[in-house]
């Protein structure tokens, strides 16, 4: 009790000082816990294994953050958002970075690394600078009935997960105002790789830019995205990266009232490689009482091959998913979900969740189920 009072006093002092300066600061977050069971996971020795546990962030990654605005006058506002992930069920969860390092914060990669940006908003639109979600991720999450969460999320097979492009560091972005339903996003990433300082082994800094256009009016949503990442691929397995990865997305949704149908198609090509990687998903959301039935079909096909080498075969994976969410209030819901992935002879995907991430085994199927609760504050 004493600790709670101290924490409230400290936060109260902080927000009080901010409010005194004309700012509006809000504390927000969510905590999500669910019982999960996964099969078809890699055991590290060419075989499969299973996992059962109490996972955090099944539907949405656990987080806590501060966001705020300051009225600068003349319709101009200063805005910011800093957000950190945390592991609501403990740090023993099977969550790791792309390099295999366990994540203490479960999502985001570090303290205040889910988001951390500052910007200006006005009649001209919004300009933001810092660590931000990518437009590619936003598009997938918006079209996915599972919202990039639960066992059936599009991220199990998507290129956003494959290329690790959920968020980006050192992003300068501009979002247009809504122009009769049309909105646009333009962003430049100063450090799409490890940093902006060239090294002996990587003298070329990887940078990226993206353009996104979307139309939304009533029941209709449709959009297109193009992204270019420089110095991301090399002509040999261990060579210096001088080639680009270029990708695009086409997406749309229509809400019929009794059901919402959504879909997305995305494709990526790499310099020094023939072929491409393609992913597409079609989803269905059906409101039922205070909840909704969720369903989707997702397919990933990868024909990328280093120039001069044979194109891969059997590189197609398919995912079938179904779920249900039940709202107890505007802030609290219950959920249940199930997903199954059929891997081709050259794919090794595994079912995960918003936070759980696993590797599968080529040619072996993977399944996952979850039941849990999410509370937002």
What are these regions (language model features)?
Residues 22-37, 51-191, 205, 214-221:
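Outer membrane beta-barrel
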């Amino acid at each position: 009790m004493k600790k709670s009072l101290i924490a409230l006093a400290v936060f109260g002092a902080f927000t009080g000082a901010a409010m005194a300066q004309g700012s509006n600061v809000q504390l927000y977050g969510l905590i999500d816990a669910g019982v999960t069971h996964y099969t078809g996971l890699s055991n590290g020795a060419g075989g499969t294994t299973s996992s059962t546990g109490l996972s955090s962030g099944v539907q949405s990654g656990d987080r806590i953050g501060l966001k705020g605005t300051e009225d600068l006058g003349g319709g101009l506002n200063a805005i910011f958002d800093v957000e950190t992930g945390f592991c609501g069920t403990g740090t023993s969860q099977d969550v790791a970075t792309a390099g295999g390092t366990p994540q203490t914060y479960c999502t985001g990669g570090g303290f205040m690394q889910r988001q951390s940006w500052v910007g200006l908003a006005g009649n001209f639109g919004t300009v933001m600078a810092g660590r931000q979600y990518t437009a590619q991720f936003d598009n997938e999450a918006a079209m996915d009935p599972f919202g990039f969460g639960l066992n059936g999320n599009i991220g199990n097979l998507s290129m956003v997960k494959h290329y690790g492009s959920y968020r980006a560091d050192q992003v300068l972005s501009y979002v247009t105002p809504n122009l009769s339903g049309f909105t646009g996003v333009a962003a430049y990433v100063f450090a799409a790789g490890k940093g902006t300082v060239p090294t002996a082994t990587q003298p070329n800094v990887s940078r990226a830019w993206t353009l996104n256009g979307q139309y939304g009016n009533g029941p209709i949503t449709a959009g297109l995205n193009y992204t270019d990442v420089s110095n991301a691929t090399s002509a040999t397995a261990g060579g210096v990266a001088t080639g680009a990865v270029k990708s695009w997305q086409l997406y749309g949704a229509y809400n019929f009232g009794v059901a919402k149908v959504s879909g997305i198609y995305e494709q990526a090509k790499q310099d020094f490689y023939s072929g491409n990687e393609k992913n597409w998903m079609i989803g269905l959301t059906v409101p039922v009482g205070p909840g909704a039935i969720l369903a989707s079909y997702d397919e990933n096909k990868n024909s990328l091959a280093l120039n001069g080498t044979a194109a891969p075969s059997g590189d197609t994976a398919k995912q079938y998913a179904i779920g249900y969410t039940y709202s107890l209030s505007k802030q609290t819901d219950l959920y249940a979900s199930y997903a199954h992935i059929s891997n081709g002879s050259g794919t090794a995907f595994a079912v995960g969740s918003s936070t759980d991430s696993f590797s599968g085994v080529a040619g072996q199927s993977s399944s996952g189920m979850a039941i849990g609760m999410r509370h937002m504050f």
